[in-house]
Amino acid sequence: MVPGYTEETVLEVHHWTDKLFTLKTTRSPSFRFANGQFCMMGLVVAGKPLVRAYSLASANHEETLEFFSIKVPNGPLTSRLQHIAVGETILVGKRATGTLTIGNLRPGRTLWLLATGTGLAPFLSVVKDPETYERFERVVITHTCRRVQDLAYARYLEHELAADELLGEIVRPKLRYYPSVTREAFKTEGRITALLESGRIFADLALPALDPAHDRLMLCGSSEMLADTAALLEARGFEEGNSGEPGDYLVEKAFAGEKRSPLASASPAESTNLSGPA
């Protein structure tokens, strides 16, 4: 047993593409987290823990843990992790942390969850939280990727979550899913910043433009997207929040190459919630 970690058993492995995969594992009864947080996860290699920061794609009321990962060519961890099989074990850190929790936002009417690539992971946790729908009148989750096939969880967000026996009734009238692609033909093309600046996203969803009086946002994805979107929001009067002071929008810096959390020891080359410019 590695101090500070529990050993969890892999229950399911799903390969979305040659570059994206999801793991589901057992969950220690003692492991607690807030929806939107991340923890350290990895393997024992040569007798030592090899771990990276991973957002939890599962909700805190679920009995299993879920992780959404890219496959980094020659990445020390993901080059091994992508070949893991059901029944094998992984390490999961005993402590979760992170900025992307609804408690770090001021009260508002519409919650926007803006993701690129595997930055979708923490928002999968947030949209499965009943409290999210108690606090906000509308929830919009956007996912921008390079290719259509990279839009992992699209069916889940478009259909399956709304049909969920426990959550469907509160999700259906409030959740909107807005995917976009940057390098292929698709019904919605373009980077999320361009779609926000042009007003296309607001026209498509029949919603008003962003207003700091009632809109709240969370951002997770590539460092370029985070910087560009934060600048766009700041120019419109939005104030960034953190774990100490709630704000109008939140950025998970643990995966952005800045103000790295003590738990986020992932190197930029293998950061699990980073995707390149979409």
Swiss-Prot record:
Report the leader peptide range. none
Instruction: Return the EC number.
Output: 1.18.1.2
* EC class of the enzyme, as a word: oxidoreductase
Q: Which GO terms describe its biological process?
A: cellular response to oxidative stress; heme catabolic process
Mind telling me which InterPro entries this protein's record contains?
Cbr1-like_FAD-bd_dom, FAD-bd_FR_type, FNR_bac, FNR_nucleotide-bd, FNR_type-1, OxRdtase_FAD/NAD-bd, Riboflavin_synthase-like_b-brl
Its function, per the record, reads:
Transports electrons between NADPH and ferredoxin. Can transfer electrons to ferredoxins Fdx2 and Fdx8. Prefers NADPH to NADH.
- Can you name this protein? Ferredoxin--NADP reductase A
The species this protein belongs to is Sorangium cellulosum (strain So ce56)
